[in-house]
């Protein structure tokens, strides 16, 4: 009997067939196994209730090990048609958003419409490079960023008008290299937006302009609805958290004078928690903001963007955030948004502020 010999061609065919079978087996196992969403949830697919969480929430002095991210800070992956549409147009028009640059955890909710269908976005003007180096912020820094894009005000207004947004937040990098800090550029963007849609509500989250009150006046009188400037942290921690050119008292002065220049404005600020502040210091900061007329306040958890930035000292519980929300209401803030994932441009706050501004317009 003749034995059938294996030719090189026969061997290759068998090897290829085996690889195909293995690939099919892997695909089947993957289809039946956990998906990516499962990896950002607990093993049972349900996020733990914070009251039952027994992980370490605070780093003691001298400890170097990073804290484990608690379950209430884990968010879903951004997706959906509105999200994809906005992201695509931003790329086409070469616009930046703080939502992406600062790695905001609420990007999917805001760009997609969320619970109240108040679709929002936060555009970052004047490029993606800042002249300051705050130790909590992931935005790129340089002493001399690229020059301003003269077409940015028009491009921004075009994009926003095509999105059909209800509420837009304009923020910016600091531009200490410019004589006016970029205030005229921001103001021109607001005017372009309002010229295309007078009904849209515009919030400007702006720098301190080195305390230059003429720059503050330029912004306050440009037609915006909400003037926002973040105090970020308590007074004692300010030199260690913010760039040395940013001062606690200077921030308070900017917020006070913005309101003086335009009493019809809503003024707004934000505090990060988890940097080592005490309750008494948070309380004092909230009182200081109320004393200069700030009407809206957000409080959220600081989250370390990279290993080069400040480490989280404490993960504040949802219960404690609820306490600060109640305290803000007691102090007389028009609105207090306080929660682990709340950011200065928080969507639920924008929905509330939109209602307030709409009522004000009706009464005029």
From Swiss-Prot:
[4Fe-4S] cluster 2 binds at residues 130, 134, 137. HAMAP family: Lipoyl_synth (MF_00206). It is found in: Mitochondrion. It comes from the Eukaryota. It is an enzyme of class 2 (transferase). It catalyses: [[Fe-S] cluster scaffold protein carrying a second [4Fe-4S](2+) cluster] + N(6)-octanoyl-L-lysyl-[protein] + 2 oxidized [2Fe-2S]-[ferredoxin] + 2 S-adenosyl-L-methionine + 4 H(+) = [[Fe-S] cluster scaffold protein] + N(6)-[(R)-dihydrolipoyl]-L-lysyl-[protein] + 4 Fe(3+) + 2 hydrogen sulfide + 2 5'-deoxyadenosine + 2 L-methionine + 2 reduced [2Fe-2S]-[ferredoxin]. Its cofactor is [4Fe-4S] cluster. GO terms for cellular component: mitochondrion. Binds 2 [4Fe-4S] clusters per subunit. One cluster is coordinated with 3 cysteines and an exchangeable S-adenosyl-L-methionine. [4Fe-4S] cluster 1 binds at residues 99, 104, 110, 345. GO terms for molecular function: 4 iron, 4 sulfur cluster binding; lipoate synthase activity; metal ion binding. Belongs to the radical SAM superfamily. Lipoyl synthase family. Its EC number is 2.8.1.8. The keyword Transferase applies. Gene3D superfamilies: Aldolase class I. Pathway: Protein modification; protein lipoylation via endogenous pathway; protein N(6)-(lipoyl)lysine from octanoyl-[acyl-carrier-protein]: step 2/2. The gene is Las. The keyword Transferase applies. Keywords: 4Fe-4S, Iron, Iron-sulfur, Metal-binding, Mitochondrion, S-adenosyl-L-methionine, Transferase. It comes from Drosophila mojavensis. Its main location: mitochondrion. Pfam families: LIAS_N (PF16881), Radical_SAM (PF04055). This protein may be expected to contain an N-terminal transit peptide but none has been predicted. This is Lipoyl synthase, mitochondrial. Coiled coil: none annotated. Residues 116-334 form the Radical SAM core domain.
């Amino acid at each position: 009997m003749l034995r059938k010999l294996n030719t090189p061609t026969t061997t290759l065919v068998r090897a290829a067939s085996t690889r195909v079978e293995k690939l099919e087996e892997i695909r089947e196992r993957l289809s039946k196994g956990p998906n990516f969403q499962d990896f950002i949830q607990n093993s049972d697919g349900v996020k733990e209730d914070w009251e039952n969480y027994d992980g370490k929430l605070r780093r003691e002095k001298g400890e170097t090990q990073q804290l484990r991210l608690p379950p209430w800070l884990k968010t879903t992956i951004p997706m959906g048609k509105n999200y994809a549409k906005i992201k695509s147009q931003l790329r086409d028009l070469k616009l930046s958003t703080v939502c992406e640059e600062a790695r905001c955890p609420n990007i999917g909710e805001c760009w997609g419409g969320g619970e109240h269908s108040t679709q929002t976005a936060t555009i970052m003007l004047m490029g993606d490079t800042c002249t300051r180096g705050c130790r909590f912020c992931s935005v790129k820094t340089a002493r001399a960023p690229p020059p301003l894009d003269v077409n940015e005000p028009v491009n921004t207004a075009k994009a926003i008008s095509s999105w059909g947004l209800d509420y837009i937040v304009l923020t910016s990098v600091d531009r200490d290299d410019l004589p006016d800090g970029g205030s005229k550029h921001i103001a021109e963007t607001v005017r372009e937006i309002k010229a295309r849609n007078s009904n849209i509500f515009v919030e400007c989250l702006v720098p301190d302009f080195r305390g230059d009150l003429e720059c503050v006046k330029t912004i306050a009188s440009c037609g915006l609805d909400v003037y926002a400037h973040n105090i970020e942290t308590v007074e004692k921690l300010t030199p260690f958290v913010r760039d040395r050119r940013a001062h606690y008292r200077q921030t308070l002065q900017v917020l006070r004078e913005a309101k003086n220049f335009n009493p019809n404005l809503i003024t707004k600020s934000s505090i990060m928690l988890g940097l080592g502040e005490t309750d008494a210091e948070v309380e004092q900061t909230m009182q200081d903001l109320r004393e200069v007329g700030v009407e809206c306040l957000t409080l959220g958890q600081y989250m370390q963007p990279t290993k080069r930035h400040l480490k989280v000292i404490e993960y504040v519980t949802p219960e404690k955030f609820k306490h600060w929300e109640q305290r803000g209401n007691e102090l007389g803030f028009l609105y207090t948004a306080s929660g682990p994932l709340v950011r200065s441009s928080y969507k639920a706050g924008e929905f509330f502020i939109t209602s307030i501004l709409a009522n004000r317009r009706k009464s005029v």
